[in-house]
């Protein structure tokens, strides 16, 4: 570890925090339908879209209607993605003449991008046409990201409103999010990436002659436009198989820093939106503080583990830490930081191979996902995931003092706690259940690239990543099989929607409650005590849930590596 390395981490954190308030102010006004600097340009477009779709922007929805609209929207999205992938060979913008995607792979990919997971059992440049990348994937990157933000806004309204039956209008929210938030950022962002050296073309792949005289085909395409929303929307699916480790997908140190920044910025800003909408910005800062504590611990451990290397490397006289699977142009600190950022959020993009991290270094991204990616998290999903843990923490605190739990003026009762537990328990049920099945089925075991604890970690990582809607992977696992295409798609679908439905039920329940004025017995929720309480509940619930599985994988692998019995 170096002083310069810690300075890079500190600079990243400082820039994220500096952007929280201005973006929070802007997003609050967008979803409240108030004036913004872009209103004169975009309001006519917004109004035209409502008229074309027959949507009344003043008509709000009950939580169940809101949720059903979201589900119908996703059914349509799935149909479009699947159809484009299966008909790819017949559609235009296919200069490499890619064939139709196999049914099971198309199903897996459609569910993957629908749920904001972007798990990829294929190499983009060798499997998909430009039209598939743009119409099926990039298009869905915008919509899945907007959906996450919209769902977070619905839950925020549940906390901020009183004695009402509605939590907003799904169609209005998703239109405003796409028009006013995602597109205005992604357009200049994509131009910045082109300036940094990223391709943006519909031209054919380039045939080149290397210095040795060999022929090589260089894949290009509409990369910058996809990468911009891939990062901002915490989608993560790469245009190229190597994802952000590819020089065309992440050309420079500056593009690497900005891509990490874009992964975090909207999720962090939503904590400020929460504070503004409930009338107390300190509440938002407290939630961001919980996220910050967990993030700092994670990056400290990951950076230390990768910079320290392994006992085997030390015995060979190799100094400088573990550089296996990392780009020299980024080094250890930028690779470790990217890994923690991409799994603290539900992004899943990678600029290094997580499978090549040390056992302890690779365990941190795994833990981030197993906690539910609540450390900033996916756009929207991180905030509503964190608020579920806040509900449980407030409930525990209420039990300790013998009072009905309250949070920001709303009583937390049995219905909210049951729904929160249902949403939280979905993740371990999926990733532990499918992992247990996969490690005993011969056909699934055959896909493992390694035996022993690391092979177990590969399978556990895959199902954790799918259930948490992350999409990153330990690359040693061959995922493009019928078993993994089907089971990972199931994990992605359940992990997304079985968390959303209980969350929306909580939003509807809270919106119908009266505001309770604070009293002498009300737990303060803006200070260090509250931050510590929430962190403690997260670690206790998480530790009890996934520690046994970690003990079979990365922990025993780390112990073996330290004893020089396993590299």
From Swiss-Prot:
It is found in: Cell inner membrane. It is a multi-pass membrane protein. The keyword Lipid biosynthesis does not apply. Its main location: membrane. Pfam families: KdpA. It comes from the Bacteria. Keywords: Cell inner membrane, Cell membrane, Ion transport, Membrane, Potassium, Potassium transport, Transmembrane, Transmembrane helix, Transport. GO terms for molecular function: P-type potassium transmembrane transporter activity; potassium ion binding. Signal peptide: none annotated. The chain crosses the membrane at residues 3-23, 64-84, 136-156, 179-199, 254-274, 285-305, 330-350, 357-376, 421-441, 473-495, 527-547. Part of the high-affinity ATP-driven potassium transport (or Kdp) system, which catalyzes the hydrolysis of ATP coupled with the electrogenic transport of potassium into the cytoplasm. This subunit binds the periplasmic potassium ions and delivers the ions to the membrane domain of KdpB through an intramembrane tunnel. PANTHER family: POTASSIUM-TRANSPORTING ATPASE A CHAIN (PTHR30607), POTASSIUM-TRANSPORTING ATPASE POTASSIUM-BINDING SUBUNIT (PTHR30607:SF2). Belongs to the KdpA family. This is Potassium-transporting ATPase potassium-binding subunit.
């Amino acid at each position: 570890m170096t002083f310069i390395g810690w300075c890079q981490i500190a600079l990243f954190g400082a820039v994220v925090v500096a952007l929280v308030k201005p973006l929070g102010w802007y997003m609050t006004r967008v979803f409240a339908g108030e004036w913004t600097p872009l209103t004169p340009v975009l309001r006519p477009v917004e109004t035209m879209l409502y008229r074309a779709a027959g949507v009344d922007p003043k008509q709000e929805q009950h939580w169940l209607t809101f949720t059903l609209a979201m589900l119908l929207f996703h059914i349509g999205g799935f149909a479009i993605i699947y159809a484009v992938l299966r008909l790819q060979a017949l559609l235009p913008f296919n200069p490499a003449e890619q064939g139709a995607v196999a049914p099971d792979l198309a199903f897996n990919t459609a569910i993957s991008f629908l749920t904001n997971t972007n798990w990829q059992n294929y190499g983009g440049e060798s499997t998909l046409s430009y039209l598939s990348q743009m119409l099926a994937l990039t298009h869905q990157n915008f919509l899945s990201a907007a959906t996450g933000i919209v769902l977070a806004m619905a839950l925020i309204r549940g906390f901020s409103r009183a004695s009402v039956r509605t939590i907003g209008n799904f169609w209005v929210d998703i239109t405003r999010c796409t028009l006013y938030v995602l597109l205005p950022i992604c357009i200049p962002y994509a131009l910045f990436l082109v300036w940094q050296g990223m391709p943006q073309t519909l031209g054919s792949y380039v045939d080149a002659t290397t210095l040795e005289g060999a022929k090589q085909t260089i894949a290009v395409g509409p990369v910058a436009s996809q990468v911009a929303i891939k990062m901002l929307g915490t989608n993560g699916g790469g245009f190229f198989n190597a994802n952000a480790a590819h020089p065309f997908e992440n050309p420079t140190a500056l593009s690497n820093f900005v891509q990490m920044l874009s992964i975090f910025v909207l999720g962090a800003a939503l904590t400020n939106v929460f504070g503004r909408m409930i009338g107390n910005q300190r509440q938002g800062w407290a939630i961001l503080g919980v996220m910050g504590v967990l993030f700092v611990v994670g990056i400290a451990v990951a950076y230390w583990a990768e910079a320290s290397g392994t006992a085997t490397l030390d015995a060979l006289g190799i100094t400088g830490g573990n550089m296996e699977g990392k780009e020299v142009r980024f080094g250890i600190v930028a690779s470790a930081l990217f890994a923690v950022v991409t799994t603290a959020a539900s992004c899943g993009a990678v600029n290094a191979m997580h499978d090549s991290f040390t056992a302890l270094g690779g365990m941190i991204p795994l833990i981030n996902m197993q906690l539910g990616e609540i450390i900033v998290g996916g756009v929207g999903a991180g905030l509503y995931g964190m608020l579920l843990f806040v509900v449980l923490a407030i409930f525990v605190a209420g039990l300790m003092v013998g009072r009905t739990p309250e949070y920001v003026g709303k009583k937390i009762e049995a219905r909210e706690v049951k729904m929160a537990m249902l949403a939280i328990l979905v993740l371990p049920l999926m990733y532990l259940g499918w992992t247990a099945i996969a490690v005993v089925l011969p056909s699934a075991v055959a896909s493992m690239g390694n035996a022993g604890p690391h092979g177990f970690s590969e399978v556990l990582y895959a199902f954790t990543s799918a259930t948490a809607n992350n999409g990153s992977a330990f690359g040693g696992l061959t995922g493009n099989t019928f078993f993994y295409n089907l089971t990972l798609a199931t994990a992605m679908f359940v992990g997304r929607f079985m968390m959303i439905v209980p969350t929306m039920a909580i939003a509807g329940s809270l919106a119908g409650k009266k505001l309770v004025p604070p009293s002498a017995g009300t737990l303060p929720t803006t200070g260090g005590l509250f931050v510590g309480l929430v962190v403690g509940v997260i670690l206790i619930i998480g530790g009890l849930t996934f520690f046994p599985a970690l003990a079979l994988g990365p922990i025993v692998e780390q112990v073996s590596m330290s004893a020089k019995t396993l590299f």
